[in-house]
């Protein structure tokens, strides 16, 4: 999986993840 990017909140998650929300990422 590609890294998650939460553009609306300006946050990002390094590495692979299954879901991305404002300020947090689930692996």
UniProtKB/Swiss-Prot annotation:
Molecular function (Gene Ontology), one example: metal ion binding
Residues binding Cu(+) 4: 9, 22
Organism domain of life: Eukaryota
Identification of the protein by name: Metallothionein-like protein CAP5
Residues holding Cu(+) 3: 6, 22
Keywords on record: Copper, Metal-binding, Metal-thiolate cluster
Protein family per UniProt: Belongs to the metallothionein superfamily. Type 8 family.
Organism: Colletotrichum gloeosporioides
Low complexity compositional bias, start-end: 1-18
Sequence positions that bind Cu(+) 6: 13, 20
Renumbered residue ranges of the record's region Disordered: 1-27
Residues given in the record as Cu(+) 1 binding sites: 4, 25
Binding residue positions for Cu(+) 2: 6, 25
Binding site for Cu(+) 5: 9, 20
């Amino acid at each position: 999986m590609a890294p998650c990017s939460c553009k609306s909140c300006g946050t990002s998650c390094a590495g692979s993840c299954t879901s991305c929300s404002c300020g947090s990422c689930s692996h």
